[in-house]
Amino acid sequence: KSKNYRAIWISDIHLGSSGAQAEHLLEFLRYNDSNYLYLVGDIIDGWSLTKRWYWPQSHNDVIQKILRKARKGTKITFIPGNHDEGARTFLGITFGDIEIKNETFHKTARNEKLWVIHGDLFDEVMQHARWLAYIGDSAYTFLLWLNKWFNRIRRLMNLPYWSLSQFLKLKVKKAVSIINAFETLMVREASRRGCDGVVCGHIHK
């Protein structure tokens, strides 16, 4: 039986890359509905697709499921990230009942105002050392590939899914300090906009 929520936020799915967990997302979308659905960037991995075309049926099914939700009345907002930044060309346009925006604001049931943005525009590496971001992306893609095979072995042993890439990232002191600095910056920016909180993606946490 489906559960219904006021709002659901999804980010950093990276459809078009072999590391995308499309089947898990599809399962989630089947059994969870909402009045508002925010796609908070990096839904499609344009960087990966330009290197190698990868688009299995499960990735197509996710897109179709999202479009179906929009047709059935879910108010969907797509906020592009750095991996699907090509969509920023269409800001302000509604595509298949999905509104494309650079950022938006969500009012909670408790009347709290949340700032919703992907976050890459506030990432120093993305803005000033883009080449470094591409190198980091290649390393992360390899980690996701490793993660996939690692979890296949875990499934054979009847063990639950466990994110190796997330574990390693949180164990590296430098990565932790960068993540903490990013989170502090985003909270400060949200406050500057008169918001009670921020919902963002980008750092995969």
Q: What does each model-identified segment do?
A:
Residues G96-E103, N111, W115, D120, ...:
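Conserved beta-sheet core of the metallophosphoesterase superfamily
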